[in-house]
Amino acid sequence: MVSTDAHSVVIDPFLTGNPKAAAKPEDLKVDAVIVTHGHGDHLGDAIEIANRNNCPIIGVYELVTYCQRKGAKQGHPLHIGGSYNFPFGRVKLVPAWHGSAFVEEDSSIVYTGNPAGVLLFMDGKTVYHAGDTGLFGDMKLIGDRHSIDLAFLPIGGNFTMDIDDAVEATKLLRPKIVVPMHYGTFPVIEADPAEFAQKVQAAVPEVTVKILQPGESVSL
């Protein structure tokens, strides 16, 4: 969750069924719910949280349409490269290399558009949430065009970048602070964030690594 004194936004709220979750859907008070792609561990509790807070789900068009068909009362569709100024700040979607589909209870698969990363501009700060993604060269373009205060990068491997690729991503993006994510939730994505921190320090010492435990925060 990204918060200022006046506003809060949550990204990919996978709480129910998440063994690492430190909050419940009813605990969150937010102005918007941003979803990077349609996999169940990212769509998570988005619809419930958005409806409880009478706020929109923000994401690519197909995903927002799917959420509205599933009961979301408000949605704001964007697409890759698109941005919009909301009362809490500006949201811009950027590419991510991954998949995006929701597996229904009957095992049918529903296409939910392209996966995305998110640039979030709030209170004079820029936050980049990569979503689930592999390493790609245009991360340099994202870093060149935006002075990123805080970046969230996956390190778990298997479905996303591993530690070494995430270090390369950090070199391309050059954020002030980077937080590793998408690791340790399941055995197949076990990774050591301390190893990531050591390798970032060696490769780009001007970048600060913050390793957060569930419920912890970092201030900008």
Map each language-model feature to its residues.
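Active-site environment of divalent metal-dependent phosphoester hydrolases
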Residues: 17-18, 39-44, 64-67, 82-85, ...
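Glycine/small-residue-rich loop that forms an oxyanion/phosphate-binding "nest" at active or ligand-binding sites
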Residues: 47-103
